[in-house]
Amino acid sequence: MPIQVLPPQLANQIAAGEVVERPASVVKELVENSLDAGATRIDIDIERGGAKLIRIRDNGCGIKKDELALALARHATSKIASLDDLEAIISLGFRGEALASISSVSRLTLTSRTAEQQEAWQAYAEGRDMDVTVKPAAHPVGTTLEVLDLFYNTPARRKFLRTEKTEFNHIDEIIRRIALARFDVTINLSHNGKIVRQYRAVPEGGQKERRLGAICGTAFLEQALAIEWQHGDLTLRGWVADPNHTTPALAEIQYCYVNGRMMRDRLINHAIRQACEDKLGADQQPAFVLYLEIDPHQVDVNVHPAKHEVRFHQSRLVHDFIYQGVLSVLQQQLETPLPLDDEPQPAPRPIPENRVAAGRNHFAEPAVREPVAPRYTPAPASGSRPAAPWPNAQPGYQKQQGEVYRQLLQTPAPMQKPKAPEPQEPALAANSQSFGRVLTIVHSDCALLERDGNISLLALPVAERWLRQVQLTPGEAPVCAQPLLIPLRLKVSGEEKSALEKAQSALAELGIDFQSDAQHVTIRAVPLPLRQQNLQILIPELIGYLAKQSVFEPGNIAQWIARNLMSEHAQWSMAQAITLLADVERLCPQLVKTPPGGLLQSVDLHPAIKALKDE
């Protein structure tokens, strides 16, 4: 058989094999087109599970008469025009294949009208060459698509359709997912002339939990913990069910969205599962409805024709971001308030760059948020309950080991640095455990502090280094090892391999897990403070340091690592400084009582005050 160009209908039918799997696939593509058109109301009529009829009517912007024929052509779209558009796609559709593919395996009719037109127009394609016919019609502003007799001309595909009930259940599930993505759109679904679902739009700032409860059920709503988590261009919001009360029915609720697009992403699911693993049984699954917002340039949605999958350019960053966001809410929910002193103490884990932006809790009475000034009291992240301020930081009151991203030790031990200050008595006055309030940032890396009328300067990089050393130093139990998404394999010399084997037990206490063979070592896990570091540089330097040592003490290794970690902040902000000091005050209370050299320097204002008075 000679090489020849396929007829348009056959080419479209082949493409339909990827795009149009079943009636639910048709509904998904058409409803997404309606959303891209700006519709605020979408009516969906289904007959016989979608095999007989699928009708989608919307009140979107409509399609102009002279573009109707193009709308049914392959690779015709109004959503992108260049590679730059594709690399920053924000619309749900963009491939220009859906309508052509659907019309090649069904009897499709497209009726539309724009606000500028006086009348509506109807288009349909037929014949081997898929010629489009356009004629006048009666229709309000918006678009209606009718898909009749799906797979009527491809019997092999039609016989693979399941029962009417099964196919409609798939459609119902698709609509549930879309309704969770767009709270601002009214969606009505009917089957065989009977209204089955009515999802009314929620006004801006309205009670989204109403639709959440209607879609996911009251059982999920009662256990839902609200999430609002942000870092740079990444934002995670939504709800995750309390894993301590997860049931098999709740475990079926697993919805995730990337920039408003519903996804089935293994990386996202793995991050959520890993965050919940300490609280879930081996046969349990987490329940969640989560929305990830990311810079469109950092995600590739052009992976599969059905657009079910995405690729992240920085997959490890996204994984760890979701991991930490979910875990922070789960741990906050577990916190139990204890009797407090007269003054509130810092919260357990202030969320970096997200404290003020933390979302309101829709599932409990709103907590009163104290302002940052005149005294630091961090705003809680949103969760299922108002978070109580953390009680006085005492060695005997810490969370259980295994809180993967909290990197807290069960009993913070004194830092094993030769010149470290002696630990103080557990019961400290409230004021003695605070550096004071942050007034401003000086020279990009120093915090100007005020406490009891006294002014001082604190070196933020030094405080960060001390904090990391405490986080890395094992207490009664080893530091938690966090598995690397992609293990790091390095070539080592015989001397380096010997040093690693001698230091293996000490490294294990620090949360560093590796496996060695003849000439290589594979780093499989590291503690949390190392996850965001450039391990390709840090680990070889650590191996070189170990090769020069004769004694391998975890405290000394932790001290070396803390001194060689790169700071995450070249330019410190007020929020970052406040977060750091809250962690230091909680984990290293001895530093507040007896600051080591290079950390804190008092500023004498008396000469300046005297000079002003002498003027």
Swiss-Prot record:
Q: Does the keyword DNA repair apply?
A: yes
What is known about what this protein does?
Answer: This protein is involved in the repair of mismatches in DNA. It is required for dam-dependent methyl-directed DNA mismatch repair. May act as a 'molecular matchmaker', a protein that promotes the formation of a stable complex between two or more DNA-binding proteins in an ATP-dependent manner without itself being part of a final effector complex.
Q: What keywords appear on the UniProt entry?
A: DNA damage, DNA repair
Give the organism, scientific name: Escherichia coli O157:H7 (strain EC4115 / EHEC)
The UniProt entry's GO biological process terms, in alphabetical order, are:
mismatch repair
Q: What is the lineage of its organism?
A: Bacteria, Pseudomonadati, Pseudomonadota, Gammaproteobacteria, Enterobacterales
Q: Which family does it belong to?
A: Belongs to the DNA mismatch repair MutL/HexB family.
The UniProt entry, under PROSITE patterns, shows:
DNA_MISMATCH_REPAIR_1 (PS00058)
Q: Which CDD domains match?
A: HATPase_MutL-MLH-PMS-like, MutL_Trans_MutL
Q: Which SMART domains match?
A: DNA_mis_repair (SM01340), MutL_C (SM00853)
Q: What is this protein called?
A: DNA mismatch repair protein MutL
Question: Which residue windows does the record flag with biased composition (Low complexity)?
Answer: 378-391
One Gene Ontology cellular component annotation held by this UniProt entry: mismatch repair complex
